[in-house]
Amino acid sequence: MKKMNVVAFVTLIISFLLLSQVLAELSSSSNNETSSVSQTNDENQTAAFKRTYHHRPRINCGHACARRCSKTSRKKVCHRACGSCCAKCQCVPPGTSGNTASCPCYASIRTHGNKLKCP
């Protein structure tokens, strides 16, 4: 009697594992079908599957701000402002002043008093 209970239990476990495998395969195949349908459905929807992010490369803000603030009379203030702007924008315009067209993010940051923040 005990041997029959063990055999029944093992059979039950094996059938449960097989059933769960079949269900996993079915859900996997249905996901593939819906994703392939949605990929070919519309041009705009395919962009969701092919997202590419264009991040600016990380720059050495300390070096870039040292170059930018080299001719200022208030170096600590310039370095602090330039460093926070560089960390946010990942760019610093060339030269010691001006040239903000090369980095529009850097040129558009303003203080609470609506003054340009970045030197």
UniProtKB/Swiss-Prot annotation:
Residues 1-24 form the signal peptide. InterPro entries: GASA. Keywords: Disulfide bond, Gibberellin signaling pathway, Secreted, Signal. GO terms for biological process: gibberellic acid mediated signaling pathway. One of its GO terms (cellular component) is extracellular region. Six disulfide bonds may be present. It is found in: Secreted. It comes from the Eukaryota. Gibberellin-regulated protein that may function in hormonal controlled steps of development such as seed germination, flowering and seed maturation. Belongs to the GASA family. This is Gibberellin-regulated protein 9. It comes from Arabidopsis thaliana. The gene is GASA9.
